[in-house]
Amino acid sequence: MKVLGIESSCDETGVAVYDTALSGVPALRAHAVYSQIALHAEYGGVVPELASRDHVRKLLPLIRQTLGEAGLRIDELDGVAYTAGPGLVGALLVGAGVARSLAWALDVPAIGVHHMEGHLLAPLMEDDPPQAPFVALLVSGGHTQLVSVKALGSYEVLGETLDDAAGEAFDKTAKMMGLPYPGGPQLAALAETGTPGRYKFARPMTDRPGLDFSFSGLKTQVLLAWRSSDQSDTTRADIARGFEDAVVETLAIKCLRALDAAGCNTLVVAGGVGANKRLRARLQEAAQRRGGRVCFPRPALCTDNGAMIAFAGALRLQAGEHADAAVHVTPRWDMACLPPLAAARESGVGNRE
């Protein structure tokens, strides 16, 4: 089954083709992503209306490009998957409308995919994929969640942020210190040059039981430190390092607690912040110490992309799911409400025998 995946939940237009006849890395026949960073930079954040209009402009050219790179004609597709939520409603509707139209014209099934399930399943596209049960850390600009995955499609949220997501905290902290948009990657790059330990910030909510997160207080702590400093380039880098260390250590502590709570030893990390080098190194170190395993998607598949939507959609289409002819999107959508992936269980994909 060759499935076209369309991602348009926010400010990246992603398209990919996943082929279930193959496995591992080669199964991803082609993928392309167009980022709207330059479009939104002058506003310091994503403008929903501009995001929607840009998806309209970029989606069809990206589909043509991706099919060309995959060496496929459009009539060779067996299904179309699209992000149905959560996300910006206008942006979601663009992708859903194009996907449903293509599916109708080609007389193939279409399926709406949960954006965060796409992220969660992305590491399964790599060689030697993780097997359920495992714990997933979903960490991005809009979400920070710890999820127990008993089987593919069977999700229990163990903890989540009570305010800012980790990626959002990165972006807002960077903006407070005068770094350009998008701030998160800029702050992480700057932290590489900072002096460890000069600024030591709190590890929020790690001094009490529970698996929820909170980053708003940390953000305020950094703001106060910045305002009272000499605001030199050196100090900016040192504060960035202190902030990143605090976030990384907080995530690591909570991940280890979640593994203990779930009674498993495999951790999956996905979402845009999952590309952070310091986070990857810290979690790999923690996994080795406990004799466990941590799995990441390749960095290009950490940020929003069509590949994860094509893959998640392919699994659900194989399970017999498909959308009706109407265009449905769900801007707010609880992943725990998703149905189990029966076909994936039967085939052994991502589940222990």
UniProtKB/Swiss-Prot annotation:
UniProt binding sites for Fe cation: H115, H119, D304
Details of cofactor binding: Binds 1 Fe(2+) ion per subunit.
Entry's Gene Ontology cellular component terms: cytoplasm
Catalyzed chemical reaction(s): L-threonylcarbamoyladenylate + adenosine(37) in tRNA = N(6)-L-threonylcarbamoyladenosine(37) in tRNA + AMP + H(+)
InterPro entries found in the cross-reference section: ATPase_NBD, Gcp-like_dom, KAE1/TsaD, Peptidase_M22_CS, TsaD
Main localization, broad class: cytoplasm
Binding site for substrate: L138, V139, S140, G141, G142, D171, G184, N276
EC number: 2.3.1.234
Gene3D superfamilies: 3.30.420.40
CDD domains associated with the record: ASKHA_NBD_TsaD_bac
Annotated compartments: Cytoplasm
EC top class named in words: transferase
Classification via PANTHER family: TRNA N6-ADENOSINE THREONYLCARBAMOYLTRANSFERASE, TRNA N6-ADENOSINE THREONYLCARBAMOYLTRANSFERASE, MITOCHONDRIAL
Protein's job: Required for the formation of a threonylcarbamoyl group on adenosine at position 37 (t(6)A37) in tRNAs that read codons beginning with adenine. Is involved in the transfer of the threonylcarbamoyl moiety of threonylcarbamoyl-AMP (TC-AMP) to the N6 group of A37, together with TsaE and TsaB. TsaD likely plays a direct catalytic role in this reaction.
Protein name: tRNA N6-adenosine threonylcarbamoyltransferase
Organism: Xanthomonas euvesicatoria pv. vesicatoria (strain 85-10) (Xanthomonas campestris pv. vesicatoria)
